[in-house]
Curated annotation (Swiss-Prot):
Source organism: Rattus norvegicus
A matching Pfam family: Keratin_assoc
Residue positions where Phosphothreonine is found in the record: T124
Gene it is expressed from: Krtcap2
Lumenal side: 1-5, 56-75
Identification of the protein by name: Dolichyl-diphosphooligosaccharide--protein glycosyltransferase subunit KCP2
Pathway(s) where this gene product acts: Protein modification; protein glycosylation
UniProt-recorded Gene Ontology molecular function terms: enzyme activator activity; protein-macromolecule adaptor activity
Amino acid sequence: MVVGTGTSLALSSLLSLLLFAGMQIYSRQLASTEWLTIQGGLLGSGLFVFSLTAFNNLENLVFGKGFQAKIFPEILLCLLLALFASGLIHRVCVTTCFIFSMVGLYYINKISSTLYQATAPALTPAKVTGKSKKRN
């Protein structure tokens, strides 16, 4: 099921806002045990993915289709937002958020390159059909 760019912008923005609010509401519980701090980093990574999706959809609406997110400023801005939100919970959440975000970014890049990158045809060297001189 594919949604349009505007709908995707609205959904990812709403999910980013709800995830940030949920992280702040349950910050004491997320910081209470080791496993929940790791889960807090995982939630921060989800915030990174949703905010990056919203940011890129906004750019596609403003600048037109085919506009791609670059490392600076889009990815770094969304990563800093997610790391800041995770840092409000616990400092271990920042580390796990960074690790989960980098793994998620790797797979997002891998999937998008297989879907949207055009493959260049393989060039084969042409045979030279000229006459060669015989040397005695």
